[in-house]
Amino acid sequence: MDSDQIIVIEEKNGEAEPASVVAAGPERFINRELSWLHFNRRVLEEAVNPSHPVLERVRFLSISANNLDEFFMVRVAGIKAQVREGITERSPDGLTPAEQLVLINEAVSRLASDQQAIWRDLRGILTEAGIVLLDGRDATKSQRAWIEDHFLHNIFPLLTPLAIDPAHPFPFIPSLGFTIGLQLARVSDGKSMNALIRMPGKIDRFIRLPPNGKDQSVRLMTLEQATSLFIGRLFPGYVVKGQGSFRVIRDSELEIEEEAEDLVRLFETALKRRRRGSVIRLEVDSTMPEELRAFVQRALSTADDEVLLVDGVLAMNELSQLTRVDRPDLEFPPYVPRHPERVRDHGGDIFAAIRKKDLIVHHPYESFDVVVQFLQQATRDPDVVAIKQTLYRTSNNSPIVRALAEAAEAGKSVTALVELKARFDEEANIRWARDLERAGVQVVYGFLELKTHAKLSLVVRREGNTLTTYVHTGTGNYHPVTARIYTDLSYFTSDPIIGRDAARVFNYITGYAEPSDIEKMAVSPLTLRKRMLEHIRGETAFARHGKPAAIWLKMNSLVDPDIIDALYEASRAGVSVELVVRGICCLRPGVPGLSENIRVKSIIGRFLEHGRVYCFGNGHGLPSAKAAVYISSADMMPRNLDRRVEILCPLLNPTVHQQVLEQIMVANLKDTEQSWQLLPDGSSTRMKAAKGEEPFNVHNYFMTNPSLSGRGKSLKESSPRRLTRRSERHQSP
């Protein structure tokens, strides 16, 4: 195979097919931004999934819209900045920033059009189910009277009509700000003017009307439609000649100076600057008159390619508010997470349960309460002398923060690493940091140039004449709310080696001293990349020597070129590579001569797949008791491997090893009901069970089957259904 050959992707009937392939050229990578858009399309496809209740389908539509907003605020904003600065450096797949923008705009245009079409269908289904969205013209006389009364008492006081003239310049519109633009004419002399009405951001988008007699249908009207009915109340003496809504999305990246004496004040200043970031996207109601649209564009300094004309509803992310309607028959049946019985076997003493044996808690199927309990018990336990904790994201009124504060107030040594650079949670984290400092917690902020993304909690307890270290590490945030909908793994252990490694990680973060003696864990940006490459290359060597060789990896994103190239090399050597990648995947699977032994699937369903699990056969194939199995906070992206503090933690206890490898990973690979198979061109197709094989839903399996490490004594009476994988590959339609 010549080193200067490249992958060529040919189009056939609208689908990309590999024509000739090798490893050298940039075409071996899928563009990161386009791969993300493919992922968001998979999310959107769940909004048309007939097996989901209609309010859940609305939720998926809202999620896809919210995802797209953040994509523009962060990714598109960054690429536009590169274009503005004249940067022409190519991405790993060979595209300049300007070329990427063209392809992004084309893909987003199709995606946005499909979102509106899906919403029109869902609106009809909602109407049939008794949830009716009224237009102003649909309202009856009595409904209009009620809306007017509601408007005058609950909306009118919040609105500020803004005439635009030399004395009243165009106001600042915040990111995601929703505004009605107006062309008005004065009744007395016909003089025209432009005006704006900014929609208040602190009230619900949808107004619920009272029931109509015996008809118990839920009737709703949007805030902007209700406002449009009574514009005369805001501009008396004027008539409306034209109107339309618009919404802006601004650059939300933070610019942080490298040198700063006070990191908190630095971030507070940067957050104020972010609120006034440049406009990246302008969404405009397609019914807005062209002259008014041009006026808004000029005022916001937006180019034509930054404007999206919307034939439908703006701010689709707010459709999630419809799911608050009390119609449980139109939602997924409620699910109550299990509490690990093994903790109950020890009278609720989580330290005793961990001392007995390592424990993996699988969220959201098993309750996050056990993580909260771990810290709360440490707070109350007089034998606990020290607690160390990382905080990347957490919830409002966080029980984690409260436990840390109470522990410090009780005289324990408490250290909290609060990451100020957690995107869109910066303000909340500044608030938590100050609350913790007031309680006596030693708060540190880690590295200015690195985000601390590791999930790590360490409790030191005096037991007799010795100190025992209890460790929790996981794949998800210390966030009780998202733990109900994100699939993640929490690992509890009192293994002295893991305890020493965890202490070294904290010392690295607080004291900047690079640890040279970590025993079992790997830590980015120091050793995690090296460990992953060693394992991948190890499987490659096994295959070349005729030994069993297999790699199973589960993550959110696969972007790093070195990791991808190592996986390509493994595939060419004959290693069986199975990847579960929810989001971005820049690797092209199934390409002859490059990646024919690599299969990639993405699972999209009721719960958001968030865990990272990395498994290597170690010369024994998979699954095997001899395999190397890790959980991690890190995805395989350059930022995680090089610009963040992350943890890769081995699972050494046989029970948790078996649980993660033979139960969790096998179930993920076995799933056919919620899985998409990734194709060489970066697109994906829904999977279906192979002929003769029963369909399998991974989320349903874990909702109905106990875990291996958490069952305790009851495992003998209630064992999880054992999973096996057929040798045949799942077939795509």
UniProtKB/Swiss-Prot annotation:
Gene3D superfamilies: Endonuclease Chain A, Polyphosphate kinase middle domain, Polyphosphate kinase N-terminal domain. Its EC number is 2.7.4.1. One of its GO terms (cellular component) is polyphosphate kinase complex. The active site is at H453 (phosphohistidine intermediate). ATP binds at N67, Y486, R582, H610. PANTHER family: POLYPHOSPHATE KINASE. Catalyzes the reversible transfer of the terminal phosphate of ATP to form a long-chain polyphosphate (polyP). This is Polyphosphate kinase. The lineage of its organism: Bacteria, Pseudomonadati, Pseudomonadota, Alphaproteobacteria, Hyphomicrobiales.
